[in-house]
Structure formats: structure tokens, C-alpha cells
Amino acid sequence: MANRGGRHARNEDSENTINYVQCDGLAVMKMIKHCHEESSNMDLAQGALLGLVVDKCLEITNCFPFPKSGDETMDEEMYQLTVMRRLRRVNVDHLHVGWYQSSDVGNSLSLALLESQYHYQTSIEESVVVVYDTQKSSRGFLCLKAYRLTPQAIQMYKDGDFTPEAFRTLKVGYESLFAEIPIVIKNSPLTNIMMSELNELLPEDKGHNFLDLGTASVLENHMRSLIERVDELYQEAVRYNKYQQVVFKQDTEKHRALAKLAAENAVRTSKGEPTVPEEEVIKQFRPMPVPARLTATITSGQINTHAQHIAQFCSQSLAKLFITESLQNAKETKEIK
């Protein structure tokens, strides 16, 4: 994915003028269909977004899937160029404005996502990444979100410095890596008329599906993913603590060696002998490479996302429980009468 945004080069330093994303219903349906087809195979669905920028709105009018990475004979760049060239022939918007990918259990933040969006956004300044959560949407909650890298995250990637000092200087945390862009879905008037007619043909929903309490597997998946991310963050913390211990030990030995050298230089000075420069001792202690903190930051963001999903799921389940209890009590009261 990292090299899929290498076309339509734009000024990297231009201001972000996109206030919201407007997505056509047809493009949304194509994304949903592709993501659900790939989710059955446990694969990550990805594709290109096509459209144009109007004032401060990024309009997504079409999309097409990327070929599967397992097909080594497929030239991805040539495939995308061919698709856009053919769309242009039939007078369809063919400008590349970003990409989309599927997400499972709400876990969309990853190193691959950051790297891909960085390459897109530095070559196509208006580009966005649209993330579709297949599992949450299958429960009746359409989860379609658009993101862009923040200027701080782009600067951090541009510098290639992921040390703790760089994170503090740029004030970058997991909550400031991406900026969510509001997304709206627009349909044509004819589509709205057809949807209204279809809605009248559907049988009345009694609401039992919305009050289904047998969703323990959802909470179980979130808890399992949360435990895995916490364990990964713990391993990152152990590595960083070991680095700090090694640095502290090295600094102690260096100060001890400098103190010993200072005493020896004092004796040499009293005897009229030349002193040994401190650089001779300092160069014996090479600075330890600072471990990158990007992985730990991403893991922290994933933990925060899972915690938010668990809190939201539990609040919805409690609401369902109280509603079901009230309906059951009303039903029993009616039967008694």
C-alpha cells in the first residue's frame, strides 16, 4: 500500500481546506460489498477512491478495489491506471482522492495505515482514508469514518525521528496522529424515491432484532483484542525500561571514569606532565540508540479504541436490558388483566 499514492503530485505544504467528505451512495455500497466479501475470507479489503474537490468538500463519486496482494503476476500500478483510464472514457470521475480499507473489531489504527496515508497525503494533498468496520456494521450500526494525518504526524514522518524527544517536541500522541473528517452520504433524488417505495414494501419490524441480548461474542472479541494490545504495550514498556537502565549504567560509568581522569590530571599537573583530554574517555562510551516509540504509541491508540468500543457496547446492552425488562413487565401486566 505504501507506494499506491505516488501520482498526481501536489504541494505538500498547502493548507488543508477539506471540511467534510461527501460520499455518493453507489460508492458506499461498492465499498460495503467489497469489505464484506473479503471479511468472509479474513482478508483486509482495500481500494481506491475517485472523485473531486469542490470548495471545501471532498466528493467521493466512485471507487474500485485493489487486486489481492497474493497475485504476484498483477502489476498494481498498471491495474489502477487502466481502471482510471477506462472510467475517463465513459465520462466518470477518475481523479484519485484517497483509498479505503476494511476494519475488524474497531481496530483500524496500525503502522501500515499510517505509512500508506503518509505516502498518499504527501503526493495527493486532499487524500483521505475511509475505514469501514465490517463487524460493527453487521450489527446494524453503519460505521464509516474518514481520516487524515495531522500536520504534526506528517512532520514526524518527514523527519523520520520517532524518539520520545521528537514526540514531546511535536506534541504527538495516539490521539493526534489522525484527524477525523466528517463524512456524509448523498443520494440522488431518484434513489431517495426508490428507497421510500422499497421501505413501504418491507414488512413492519417488530424490533426483536434490536433487543437481542445474545451478543456476548462481540464483547469477548473486544476483550481478547484488548488483552493482546495491553500485553504488547507491556513488552514495549519492558524494552524501554531496559534501555533506560543501560543508559543510566553507562552514564554512571562515564562519570566515574571522568572523575578518575580528573584526579589523574591533577597529579600530572602537579608533576608538570601534559594532561589527558576528556574526549579520550568520552569517545569510549558510545551513545545508545534510542528505541522508537511509534509502535508503543499506536498500541496505546488501539487500547483506547477498544476501551471506547467496550464502554459503548456495554451502555447499549444495559439500555437493551432495561427496555426488554419494561416490555416484559408490560406484557405480563396485560396478560393478568
UniProtKB/Swiss-Prot annotation:
Cellular localisation: Cytoplasm
GO molecular function, one term: translation initiation factor activity
Key words of the record: Cytoplasm, Initiation factor, Protein biosynthesis
Single GO biological process annotation from the record: positive regulation of Notch signaling pathway
Pfam family, one: JAB
Domain MPN: 21-153
GO cellular component term, pick one: eukaryotic 43S preinitiation complex
Keyword Transferase annotated: no
Superkingdom: Eukaryota
SMART domains: JAB_MPN
UniProt keyword Transmembrane helix, yes or no: no
UniProt record similarity statement: Belongs to the eIF-3 subunit H family.
Free-text function comment from the UniProt entry: Component of the eukaryotic translation initiation factor 3 (eIF-3) complex, which is involved in protein synthesis of a specialized repertoire of mRNAs and, together with other initiation factors, stimulates binding of mRNA and methionyl-tRNAi to the 40S ribosome. The eIF-3 complex specifically targets and initiates translation of a subset of mRNAs involved in cell proliferation.
Protein name per UniProt: Eukaryotic translation initiation factor 3 subunit H
Natural source organism: Drosophila mojavensis
